[in-house]
Structures are given as structure tokens and as C-alpha cells.
Swiss-Prot record:
This is Histone deacetylase 3. GO terms for molecular function: histone deacetylase activity; histone deacetylase activity, hydrolytic mechanism; zinc ion binding. It catalyses: N(6)-acetyl-L-lysyl-[histone] + H2O = L-lysyl-[histone] + acetate. Residues 485-503 have a biased composition (Low complexity).
Length: 510
């Protein structure tokens, strides 16, 4: 890392180079079927955006073997998903269909399946696909043959151990981090989605082997968590950082707080690997978002993390103006590769989505920035003060490095995809063996954050420990209980059905 870059503004990617000229070994996971999954008419989440991203990458020439290794992921098996999620929740996801859901009202309520997280055709296969890609990417990083691994279909950070949330069913991020922890003593998770990364934070709230850092809109906004006072609990105290932001934050303001905080985190925590969730709903003009980042400002976070030369996993996340999402993730793939891409988009099968400007760059608007310099400075000082109290995570026994082989293609003759075995990944557990000690010790306390009571946050003399603040648990009737905005923009481009594009009336960026 170049320390002098820590104070640079969010528009520095406007220069003709990516700053760090050193090439990185990059692998990219993509399943051609992912764009076919469809949440339903009018739903903001559209997996088709991943297919649009892939098309841009292809026409920019970034899929060539000389640029990066392109891999089709193996679907995650049920037992793999259960490394984090509960058995009954995974069994429900596997069994439920649009036709059978009407008879399972109690289970739907129990697992938080509804308007935000609907049942749709191929739901379980969709979860297997994006989770398998994230875990496969983590395996590649553990092998040491790649410096950066990318899965734009992943990053679904709201899913909990036993429930869906915020368009997310399976938390592929937690599964990927558990994989990385097999080799790395400490893993850093950074979230630049506009929504708080609550599912990942909750999963690792009581451990010091994972540090979570979330930059998000805070207030009457989904999911309603992510208070700056939420700092972790027990062994995880001070290993959880929340950076609450207000509407309209622009590139320069964002980088003025992102770079100093992350620089200090990297100095104090010294992670063996970094997971960066690149939710694109923090871009200007997002259908559900209220930030004002340009595409270059968003990508500056990727560029900055790349400069540390630590194994880096790039994941997708939110993003609901899909022409912006595709351009953002294409641009960030170029940043990961150290490739400068021309501004004018090459002609591709989705070219009409990107008019009238047909530019790779997502521009910021003139919306008001409600984040004052004073507010940002106070937040930064608070976070840096918490970081000053850090102690390095204790050493753990390292596993022997896994020998590198090609990730095998799925066996199409095997009828049940949940029984396919990936010999390249030690992530796949034997059905008849108990979960390994390291995974068990990390996940047995998952859910502790939710169960912390006021009496548990008092010391032995009865004095309340206000530093161990527990953020609000949003109820169904709360303002922030649904991720879907009540209004949308008539100019937003959306997908009506898989592979069938049209303009969706009644949807607009805030």
C-alpha cells in the first residue's frame, strides 16, 4: 500500500492508470444460468444484472485466458450450506416451491419468506449456485494460486442462520469466510453496500478471528441495525466496526472516511485475507439507494484494497438500477486486473440498456450531501479510538496448504446435484462426520448477538456497559422492516422476465 494515498479523494480513478501497475492473478466465477432466476414481477432484485455484467466483460475482452481464469462454480451441497445455516432452514429451502408454499404458512413466517424474499422457481438451485461460487472463490485463494477471486452473483449479506432477509436466502459471505478461516488466522470483511451488513456481523459478533467493517446508511432504513456503538461482544469486542452515514454522501466524503479507517484496520488487524462486498446500491441513482457515489468513487474502494496485496475476495451484493450495476462491476473487474477500460461501451447484446450515454462510467448527481465534515470527523475519531483498543487475534494452528488442482466440472450424469463432490475443496464435509472443531467453535455462538439482554451487558457490580450497545431489532411493522422502497423511478430499466427486458413503469431512483 502507498500510505500517501490514504487521504485521496474518491475521484482518483479518473487518471489513466489503476495506480498499482503490478498485475494480479485473478479468477472469476460465473454460472450462465444465474441470470435466469427471477424473483417475480416488480421485485427490485434481478439476477439478470450478473448476466449483463458478464456480457460487458466479454465484449471488453476481459474473459480471455491471458487476463483471468474463468470458472463455472460447483453448486454448494446441503451439507455445505449447513456449515452456517440450520438444517431445518436448508431443508425448507430445498423443498419449498411456488406450488407447495400455500400449505406452509407457518414455515414461511418462521423463515421470513414473503414479499422481500419470495419463493420462486429454482430458488434452492439459485442459492446453491451463488454460494458455491463464493466458497469456490475462497478455495482458490486458499490454494495461493490467485491473488483476487471474483463472484458478482454473491455478497448476499442479510441472510441469517435460520431465516431469509433483504432479498438474501443463503449467506454466501459467511460460508466463504469460514472457508478462508481454514487457512488464515484472521479474515477482514468490508461492506460498501448502502445497507448494513447485518447477517455477516451477527455471525461473527463474538469472535476475534473475523473483523467486520460496514459503511452504510443509518437511521429509518433497512435493516435498522449498524449503530456505531455496536462493536462486538465477548472475544469479539472491538472487532466489529460500524460506520453510519447519511443521504447523499459523495466520492470525496466517502473516501475521506473509508481510507483512514481501513488503513488503520489493516495496520492493527493484519488480516490474512480480505472479503470486500461491493454492493452497487451505494451508487448515485440507485432504485433503492440514497447515496451519491460515482462508479469511479465506488471502484476506488476496490483499488485501495487491491493495493495492500493481500488475498482479496470481491463479491457483489445490492444494486437495483441494473444498468448501473453492470457497469460498476465491469469497471471494478478491470480495476482488479489492472486494466484501464475505454469509456465508450462496446456493442453488446444489452447495449440498449445503457443509453443514451453508452458510457462505462456511472456519474454522480447534484443531490445534497447531508454528511458534514464535522460529522464525518467525529465518526472517524470514534472508530479510530475503538481500533486503538484492539489486541491482535490469538494464533491458531495453520492447515497445510491445499495442493492446487483444477476445479472439476459438475458431473451432469449424477442426478442429484446435492450429492456432487468437489475433491478440490476441503469445504465439503463428509455427511457422516461431525463438523470440524474450528468451524464448530466459530459457529456455536452464532445468534448470541440477538440473545444479549440488558442484564448480560452489565458488569459484576450492576453497572451497565454502554459500549456493548445492542442495535435495534427491527420488527415487521418498523419503517426499516422491508428493503423494498415504497416508491420507484419511472426511468429505471428493469427486467420483466428472464432474458426479456422492458422498461418497468413506476420505478425510479431516489
Amino acid at each position: 500500500m502507498d500510505p500517501s494515498s490514504a487521504g485521496a479523494g474518491g475521484n482518483s480513478l479518473a487518471s489513466a492508470s489503476c495506480g498499482d501497475a503490478q498485475k494480479r492473478r485473478v479468477c472469476y466465477f460465473y454460472d450462465p444460468e444465474v441470470g435466469n432466476y427471477y424473483y417475480g414481477q416488480g421485485h427490485p432484485m434481478k439476477p439478470h444484472r450478473v448476466r449483463m455484467t458478464h456480457a460487458l466483460l466479454a465484449h471488453y475482452g476481459l474473459l480471455a485466458p491471458a487476463k483471468m481464469e474463468v470458472l463455472r462454480p460447483l453448486p454448494a451441497r446441503g451439507i455445505d450450506l449447513c456449515r452456517f445455516h440450520s438444517d431445518d432452514y436448508v431443508a425448507f429451502l430445498r423443498a419449498v416451491t411456488p406450488e407447495t408454499q400455500l400449505g406452509q404458512v407457518r414455515a414461511l413466517r418462521r423463515f421470513n419468506i414473503g414479499p422481500d424474499c419470495p419463493v420462486f422457481d429454482g430458488l434452492y438451485a439459485y442459492c446453491q449456485t451463488y454460494a458455491g461460487a463464493s466458497v469456490g472463490a475462497a478455495v482458490k485463494l486458499n490454494h495461493g494460486t490467485h491473488d483476487i477471486a471474483i463472484n458478482w452473483s454473491g455478497g448476499l449479506h442479510h441472510a441469517k442462520k435460520s431465516e431469509a432477509s433483504g432479498f438474501c436466502y443463503v449467506n454466501d459471505i459467511v460460508l466463504a469466510i469460514l472457508e478462508l478461516l481454514k487457512l488464515h488466522e484472521r479474515v477482514l470483511y468490508i461492506d460498501i453496500d448502502i445497507h448494513h451488513g447485518d447477517g455477516v456481523e451477527e455471525a461473527f459478533y463474538t469472535t476475534n478471528r473475523v473483523m467486520t467493517v460496514s459503511f452504510h446508511k443509518f437511521g429509518d432504513y433497512f435493516p435498522g441495525t449498524g449503530d456505531i456503538r455496536d462493536i462486538g461482544y465477548s472475544e469479539g469486542k472491538y472487532y466489529c466496526l460500524n460506520v453510519p452515514l447519511d443521504d447523499g454522501i459523495d466520492d470525496d466524503s466517502y473516501q475521506s472516511i473509508f481510507k483512514p479507517i481501513i488503513s488503520k484496520v489493516m495496520e492493527m488487524y493484519r488480516p490474512g485475507a480480505v472479503v470486500l462486498q461491493c454492493g452497487a446500491d451505494s451508487l448515485s441513482g440507485d432504485r433503492l439507494g440514497c447515496f451519491n457515489l460515482s462508479g469511479k468513487g465506488h471502484a476506488e474502494c476496490v483499488k485501495f484494497m487491491r493495493s495492500f496485496n493481500v488475498p482479496l475476495l470481491l463479491l457483489g451484493g445490492g444494486g437495483y438500477t441494473i444498468r448501473n450495476v453492470a457497469r460498476c462491476w465491469c469497471y471494478e473487474t478491470g480495476v482488479a486486473l489492472g486494466e484501464e477500460l475505454q469509456e465508450k461501451l462496446p456493442y453488446n447484446e444489452y447495449y440498449e440498456y445503457f443509453g443514451p450515454e453508452y458510457s462505462l462510467y456511472v456519474a454522480a448527481s447534484n443531490m445534497e450531501n447531508r454528511n458534514t465534515n464535522k460529522q464525518l470527523e467525529e465518526i472517524k475519531c470514534n472508530i479510530l479510538d475503538n481500533l486503538s483498543k484492539l489486541q491482535h487475534a490469538p494464533s491458531v494452528q495453520f492447515q497445510e496448504r491445499i495442493p492446487e488442482t483444477k476445479l472439476p466440472e459438475p458431473d451432469e450424469d449424477q442426478e442429484d446435484p446435492d450429492e456432487r463432490h468437489d475433491p478440490d475443496s476441503d469445504m465439503v464435509l463428509d455427511d457422516h462426520k461431525p463438523t470440524g472443531h474450528s468451524a464448530r467453535s466459530l459457529i456455536h455462538n452464532i445468534g448470541v448477538k440477538r440473545e444479549i439482554t440488558e442484564t448480560e451487558t452489565k458488569d459484576q457490580h450492576g453497572k451497565r456497559l454502554t459500549t456493548e450497545h445492542k442495535g435495534p431489532e427491527p420488527m415487521a411493522e418498523d419503517l426499516g422492516s422491508s428493503k423494498q422502497a415504497p416508491t420507484a423511478d419511472a426511468n429505471a430499466v428493469a427486467v420483466n422476465a428472464p432474458g426479456n427486458a422492458r422498461n418497468e413503469p413506476g420505478s425510479s431512483p431516489k
